[in-house]
């Protein structure tokens, strides 16, 4: 679980600090910085575990100028995260300018590791690292083995943290038809930000899906079963099977399946099958009918996953407790963060005056 995030000089965040709980709904007018918060998590994950080499974490935005505050390339971007991993506290800091990582600090339980410039220090040991690589680039997991490129050994507990940090944090901008698009059979068993990879996850976990109550119940309620199909060119396609009253099977291709159903299925699999500890979603309400939104609120409240979600939907806001709302606004190009002060008093006031939380936020 992520408890705190501090952002300096990333996009519209000059010097901003978030405190997170179990459910966090981020609201604000267009252009206030909601998507920039999602981008911050996306950028950080790409920074510490690049998808390609040499690493270039700015590729989505073009270059460093387009991600640094006020496009001032003299400024360093930095992040600080406090959270909990397997019941133990951690603290992580990173600062960079362009492709040069200047500092990293990692504290996990009683262990500490520090990187200044290209030198990593742990206890009385040290080694050098290229300027453009995070310390976390040195750790990777293969089936049945964990490997790392250090010239000294680490305790198993710290090694586990270093290998898995942020791997169980999902950042999503789910595009339903991309989520269920065919993938090559060697595609990783993982979901990208658009949900792509869902077909591979389903293919590799069909039996587990039938044993995962929340996912199985959702499929049964919608009279749908899932059937992966391997094609001659090495791709995997997903067919959705619907049964008629006379038990005849109707094969539905993804284009014939509602986007809201696919989005809910993706979220359910991320929460209950992949067991992601934190799920970050931009515009969580998109494509979802009221029935699905109500179900999603229950998932946010009662699952083991933490949720950080942006929304424009009054309906989602009105399902929330005032303490779960994070309010953004922008002043002279800088995002400002506010939370409801004295949420219990506000709840009493809203109830007494017959005002919805979304109405209070709007007016």
Give the predicted meaning of each segment.
Residues 220, 294-363:
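C-terminal lobe/lid and adjacent interdomain/linker elements of RecA-like ASCE P-loop ATPase modules
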Residues 227-291, 295:
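Conserved ABC ATPase signature
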Residues 88-224:
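Electropositive, glycine-dotted interaction segments
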Residues 20-62, 264-265, 270, 310:
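Phosphate-binding glycine-rich loops of NTP-binding sites
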Residues 11, 24, 42, 258, ...:
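Catalytic acidic motif of RecA-like/P-loop NTPases
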Residues 1-13:
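N-terminal pre-Walker A segment at the start of P-loop NTPase domains
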Residues 38-101:
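Conserved P-loop NTP-binding catalytic core
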Residues 13, 84-89, 221-223, 233, ...:
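Glycine-centered tight beta-turn/hairpin loop motif at sheet-sheet or coil-to-beta transitions
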